[in-house]
Amino acid sequence: MPFVGEIFAQLKAAGSNPVLQEIRDGQITAVTGTELLELVQRARTFLASKSLAKGERCGLLASNTIRWIAMDLAATAEGLIVVPLYYRQAPHELVAMMKDSTPALVCCGDATLRDGIQQNWAAAAPHFLFDEIFARVDGIALDRPQVRSEDPVTIIYTSGTSGEAKGVVLTAANVGFMLGCTSARLDLLMGGRTSHDRIFHYLPFSFCASWIAVLTFLLRGSLVTLNTDLTKIPNDMPGRAALFPQCPPIAGAHAPRR
């Protein structure tokens, strides 16, 4: 079963237990496994209403939030190729990536991000805000997740700050392999501890290692606390979690062993 189906099964098993929480202005908002699946369902319904073809690209431009994760899982389940974009990057650099990846639509966390793109690219694909996407759309029947192992599921770009940005295409099988490696490494790091981990996560999801990490945590049934403002990490971090992911250790899980 491709990774997205495994994550959905884990969320269903979590039921009324919290799986994600985000900190915003000192306030914590949490969702259970059931509630996260409901958010995914709403986003899938919105995407299905746009009659997109399998394999079309979906830009994702937002800061780290619960809805970012729901949007990513929804687009993947609908057979789309997600193009995650770093929300702090200059609009003209993001436009260059979009012109290369040609998304059919772009999902934005807020109007400021949307306007920054549209002001720099008059011919941009349709942009939709999360508030629109997660509103309920009635009368749309959803199929089972449309993902096969060989299907491309994401295009992740280099920053483009020191040269032309380059996109790397990953299939569901590629992602599934990395999730297995990362989970195995966490088993080693935790020394056989069986209780569910509590994790504070702040690295932007548009970075590959960060995205793989948070998918791994969902698969493992961990409780993940998301920082939504990088400037507030010192206030958000204390006492929130047992693990604080960094890029090198996570990326190292995928390196070949001698």
Predicted regions and their residues:
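Conserved pre-ATP/AMP-binding loop-to-beta segment of ANL
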Residues: 15-18, 140-157, 163-164, 190-198
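Conserved AMP-binding A3 loop
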Residues: 30-34, 153-180
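Structural core segment of the AMP-binding/adenylate-forming
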Residues: 49-50, 77-137, 142-148
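Conserved S/T- and glycine-rich ATP-binding loop of Class I adenylate-forming
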Residues: 58, 75, 106, 152, ...
